[in-house]
């Protein structure tokens, strides 16, 4: 899963918001289940995961730096037009969005553009999609990083500043 990646981000001092479905879909974890799993992992593994989840003055973390929010969705894909208020608020001023899984990263958001950098990670579990998307085969992995260019930031800023 994504937990080792999360731990590495936390080690580097990154605040991490994990997003999961509000309702069950296929074999995907829900936000409530994810919260419980993180608590169990923190108790078992301790260290940075426990400090990040609960805050730890000894580790220099006065407040938690690992959060779980609900996407507001209930399917294997994520429709960002129907994001929960909690997700919208947690997304303000983020530096990176990571979409993981074929439904979220490929089916619904492969060409989505964000106002921050984005990383899309998936294993392709459909032969037709693998061929069409990357001239690949089933079970090939997709890693797509889209950086927001400085020029785009300047364009957004100058457009917003104009009356």
Q: In which residue ranges do the predicted regions lie?
A:
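Short beta-alpha junction loops
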Residues: 20-26
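Short beta-strand/turn micro-motifs composed of small residues
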Residues: 18-20, 122
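Histidine-anchored nucleotide/phosphate-binding helix
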Residues: 1-18
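C-terminal functional extensions of proteins
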Residues: 30-32, 38-163
């Amino acid at each position: 899963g994504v937990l080792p990646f999360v731990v590495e981000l936390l080690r580097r001092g990154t605040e991490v918001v994990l997003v999961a479905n509000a309702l069950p879909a296929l074999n995907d974890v829900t936000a409530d289940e994810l919260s419980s799993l993180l608590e169990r992992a923190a108790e078992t593994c301790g260290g940075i995961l426990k400090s990040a989840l609960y805050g730890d003055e000894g580790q220099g973390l006065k407040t938690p730096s690992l959060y779980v929010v609900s996407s507001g969705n209930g399917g294997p894909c994520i429709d960002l037009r129907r994001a929960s208020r909690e997700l919208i608020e947690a997304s303000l001023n983020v530096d990176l969005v990571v979409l993981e899984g074929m439904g979220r990263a490929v089916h619904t958001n492969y060409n989505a553009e964000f106002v921050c950098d984005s990383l899309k990670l998936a294993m392709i579990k459909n032969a037709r999609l693998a061929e069409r998307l990357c001239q690949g085969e089933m079970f090939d992995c997709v890693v797509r990083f889209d950086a927001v260019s400085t020029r785009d930031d300047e364009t957004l800023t100058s457009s917003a500043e104009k009356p």
